């Protein structure tokens, strides 16, 4: 049976990658004072493409290495490799082509630092997290979350090359936001899907330490996240427009985290999971709008 374009598209986890590359795009905009030049737009567009292709390759490799686990979980049992729509060799070839194209674009038309950081992130997620951390420790998503948190820095590097310590610090603040956001985001899903993870012998926190403990950890990380999201204002990267948006978004997220301690029903954790996605997209949208459109309110 021939492999369809949709099957290859599904291998890239398009919804997950869309959020990843959006944060990379915001990193690009925040790296540039004022409006970008044509050269910066060109470099940024190529950087965006290279990052997107690398993230897509990482997603495909993740599905290749996790095929046996995916087959045991309701959430992932439909994936193309699991149901036999594609063969492992085809997935490997597809991911390899994406990596080669991505690295070529980044090295030749963007800059080497972006290529190095992007490749390191790919290895961090597709290999270190997927092969080792995911199966080894209940803190898998905390430690492995660093690889998934780097896209804003990749975007920043694409348009600047990270020439100064200020560039590294500011880009790192954006990475820190996603790094702290990842545990409450993923643990909310893991609570709802804990039976699947237990069946697949994956030591997610709700499986190893129980749901009540996980709920408390979600609250701790959400409080920490609310604090961390104020850092862009503290260092002068963002102004009052972002601050107002961050305060509202954090207030709702904190309410979800507090309510998770005694949820009204089993589905509440999925409601928090859904909000966490909206939260991150909106937070980074506020960062971008504050930077580009409303400088006069700072």
UniProtKB/Swiss-Prot annotation:
BP GO terms, sorted: heme biosynthetic process; heme O biosynthetic process
Membrane protein topology class: Multi-pass membrane protein
A GO term for molecular function: protoheme IX farnesyltransferase activity
CDD domains: PT_UbiA_Cox10 (cd13957)
First-listed, main subcellular location of the protein, grouped into a coarse class: membrane
TM helices/strands, residue ranges: 16-36, 45-65, 97-117, 141-161, 172-192, 223-243, 244-264, 277-297
Reaction(s) catalysed (UniProt annotation): heme b + (2E,6E)-farnesyl diphosphate + H2O = Fe(II)-heme o + diphosphate
Family: Belongs to the UbiA prenyltransferase family. Protoheme IX farnesyltransferase subfamily.
PANTHER family assigned: 4-HYDROXYBENZOATE SOLANESYLTRANSFERASE (PTHR43448:SF7), PROTOHEME IX FARNESYLTRANSFERASE, MITOCHONDRIAL (PTHR43448)
Note: Carbon 2 of the heme B porphyrin ring is defined according to the Fischer nomenclature.
Origin superkingdom: Bacteria
InterPro entries: Protohaem_IX_farnesylTrfase, UbiA_prenyltransferase, UbiA_prenylTrfase_CS, UbiA_sf
Pfam families the record matches: UbiA
The protein's name: Protoheme IX farnesyltransferase
Gene3D superfamilies in alphabetical order: UbiA prenyltransferase
Pathway(s) where this gene product acts: Porphyrin-containing compound metabolism; heme O biosynthesis; heme O from protoheme: step 1/1
One Gene Ontology CC term in the entry: plasma membrane
Keyword terms, alphabetized: Cell inner membrane, Cell membrane, Heme biosynthesis, Membrane, Transferase, Transmembrane, Transmembrane helix
Organism: Xanthomonas campestris pv. campestris (strain ATCC 33913 / DSM 3586 / NCPPB 528 / LMG 568 / P 25)
Compartment list: Cell inner membrane
UniProt entry tagged with the keyword Chaperone: no
EC number(s) from the headed UniProt entry: 2.5.1.141
């Amino acid at each position: 049976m021939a492999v369809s374009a949709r099957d290859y598209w599904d291998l890239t986890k398009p919804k997950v990658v869309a959020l990843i590359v959006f944060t990379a795009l915001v990193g690009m905009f925040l790296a540039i004072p004022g409006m970008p030049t044509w050269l910066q737009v060109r470099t940024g567009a190529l950087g965006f493409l290279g990052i997107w292709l690398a993230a897509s390759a990482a997603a495909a490799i993740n599905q290749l290495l996790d095929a046996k686990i995916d087959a045991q979980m309701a959430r992932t049992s439909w994936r193309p490799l699991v149901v036999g729509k594609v063969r492992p060799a085809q997935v490997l070839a597809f991911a390899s082509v994406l990596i080669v194209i991505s690295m070529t674009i980044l090295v030749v038309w963007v800059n080497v630092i972006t290529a190095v950081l992007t490749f390191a992130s790919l290895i961090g997620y597709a290999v270190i997290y997927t092969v080792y951390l995911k199966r080894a420790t209940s803190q898998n998503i905390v430690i492995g979350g660093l690889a998934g948190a780097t896209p804003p820095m990749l975007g920043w590097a694409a348009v600047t090359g990270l020439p100064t310590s200020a560039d590294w610090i500011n880009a790192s603040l954006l990475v820190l936001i996603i790094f702290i956001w990842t545990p409450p985001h993923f643990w909310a899903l893991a609570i709802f899907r804990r039976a699947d993870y237990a069946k697949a012998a994956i030591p997610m926190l709700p499986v190893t330490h129980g749901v009540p403990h996980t709920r408390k950890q979600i609250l701790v990380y959400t409080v920490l996240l609310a604090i961390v999201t104020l850092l862009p204002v503290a260092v002068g990267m963002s102004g009052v427009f972002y601050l107002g948006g961050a305060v509202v978004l954090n207030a709702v997220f904190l309410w979800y985290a507090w309510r998770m301690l005694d949820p009204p029903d089993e589905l509440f954790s999925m409601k928090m999971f859904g909000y966490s996605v909206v939260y991150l997209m909106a937070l980074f949208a506020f960062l971008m709008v504050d930077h580009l459109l409303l400088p006069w309110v700072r």
